[in-house]
Amino acid sequence: MRSPRVIHLACVIAYIVAVEAGDKPVYLPRPTPPRPIHPRLAREVGWELEGQGLSPLSEAELLPEVRERRSPVDKGGYLPRPTPPRPVYRSRRDASLESELSPLSVAEVLPEVRERRSPVDKGGYLPRPTPPRPVYRSRRDASLESELSPLSEAEVLPEVRERRSPVDKGGYLPRPTPPRPVYRSRRVASLESELSPLSEAEVLPEVRERRSPVDKGGYLPRPTPPRPVYRSRRDASLESELSPLSEEEVLPEVRERGSPVDKGGYLPRPTPPRPVYRSRRDASLESELSPLSVAEDLPEVRERRSPVDKGGYLPRPTPPRPVYRSRRDASLESELSPLSEAEVLPEVRERRSPVDKGGYLPRPTPPRPVYRSRRDASLESELSPLSEAEVLPEVRERRSPVDKGGYLPRPTPPRPVYRSRRDASLESELSPLSEAEVLPEVRERRSPVDKGGYLPRPTPPRPVYRSRRDASLESELSPLSEAEVLPEVRERRSPVDKGGYLPRPTPPRPVYRSRRDATLESELSPSSEAEVLPEVRERRSPVDKGGYLPRPTPPRPVYRSRRDASLESELSPLSEAEVLPEVRERRSPVDKGGYLPRPTPPRPVYRSRRDASLESELSPLSEAEGLPEVRERRSPGGQGGYLPRPTPRTPLCRSRRDANLDAEQSPVSEGVVLPEVR
């Protein structure tokens, strides 16, 4: 570029030549101090022309364009304060274009370059000068170099252009940072080990598809200390599994089973070396597979590998943890003593619980003894007269899930096995029978609670209370022989009596007679017990058949219900034998069982309005004719339930219905009124 003074002199000379050519004297204006062209304008004009690939122009050609682009500041007034020269930095996009366009001619690419000029490169003031910033090679460039080594640039260049990330295409460079090394990712390391026996030409398409987005672009992170690549649990387990196989057979499976964690991403912060602990599943598999060949069992081993063993970082190192024998192992030893291992091993594999198949060992705790469960103790007493060979298959089927695996609980003081109420009741029932006849039934009736689980905390000895059902059965079964009633008694044993822990010891509780027992006594007085007993058994409610006794309370009297009082007044002229079946059918569920309420002051039986109205209706009728109607019209409220709280005595007022009935019945005979009442 020429200086502004030279340009000014050129303008004056051109003016003088033009005046001389016209042969006309023209006075020159008063000379003014020369004003230089601002350096910024000159730089912009020259820089734009050079960027478009044009040769530098002569001063004569450049002058008209310079005049048009003179800014108002340059046309008059004082010049702005000069600023230090600002260099034009090449953008990352320009650098990337140069590397891409090297094999192409500038003439072919120039139109594309003009269209792709960013607005930042086309004009405006340059930013404040900053220290030069180097262009770092991205991870994607490094990975592309390793991928494209066997290919020619001409084949790969179109693909490279399409895969250029927006970050690489333009914008200013970031602030300079300390040089950052490019670390090899775990995925690259794993790919190298996988692709060693294969040729790069075969694997390259697969490698391109498996490139993770993290490897494709972006700035490198801040440099950190080198991090070693730890062998994952999956690698260790694969080595032990693949030892008898060749790499060529296993490599496809290895590729499919590669976890996303092994395929890419940054390495974790360095930590102290962590040992690879053998999982419980590995230990159990070794003991199971000892009599089998590894080649036969390997497919099953691969299928049973848990997701925890397949990948992920190792946990922080912890003190070595011993593998405790589970309750299931102890129980299996006692069960399998008369059998050979070869017969039982398939069943053992199927019954391995998920807890025994993998996962980390728990924190070490003091040694815990294996307590014998109540089910084991009960089975011993049951199986004494039988041979183990006959009972062992049944024992295997009845093993509860609680006995099959899991960690042992914290050690607790030894807990005695208490006899359940069911055992006590069975003893009283089975006295006239031989054990050999009852033992199969006893096995079937063992409840799940008696079959396994931990023993409760030791408590003071608890007496076995006789339930209300036992007391009622004794009174019912007195005229019958035990041999006839025992089968029915077994069927009627409630689940509550069959097992479960005894409650905390409480003072002895008396067995109260229920309202149903009192009413049955009054009903059954003229009938023989032999006729009524089967029906009584069917009508025993579940509440009367078992359950714990309530806390002792002051003695509670048995109140007669309103229904009992009304039945007495109805049944007086009839024989109890005729009415008893109907009475049984009309017994409400409330009268059939349940605990007695808290004692309250005695409550009188009030006559309901319906009873009063029925009396007035039935006065002209014979009781024999009116009784069926009375029975049908008994309200549910009068048939049972607890009596209400006592209230001040209220007089019985005649209802409107009673008044209507009186008016209707007075002029009509009794025979005509009866159908109408019904």
UniProtKB/Swiss-Prot annotation:
Region (14 X approximate tandem repeats): 1-678
Sequence repeat start and end residues: 1-67, 68-114, 115-161, 162-208, 209-255, 256-302, 303-349, 350-396, 397-443, 444-490, 491-537, 538-584, 585-631, 632-678
One of the record's GO cellular component terms: extracellular region
Entry keyword set: Antibiotic, Antimicrobial, Glycoprotein, Immunity, Innate immunity, Repeat, Secreted
Biased composition annotated in UniProt, kind: Low complexity: 145-157, 188-204, 333-345, 380-392, 427-439, 474-486, 521-533, 568-580, 615-627
Disordered, as annotated region: 58-97, 113-678
Main location class: secreted
Positions glycosylated per UniProt: T32, T83, T130, T177, T224, T271, T318, T365, T412, T459, T506, T553, T600, T647
Annotated localization: Secreted
GO biological process terms held by the UniProt record: defense response to bacterium; innate immune response
Record has Secreted as a keyword: yes
Compositionally biased region (Basic and acidic residues): 64-73, 158-167, 205-214, 299-308, 346-355, 393-402, 440-449, 487-496, 534-543, 581-590
Role played: Has antibacterial activity in vitro.
Name of this protein: Probable antibacterial peptide polyprotein
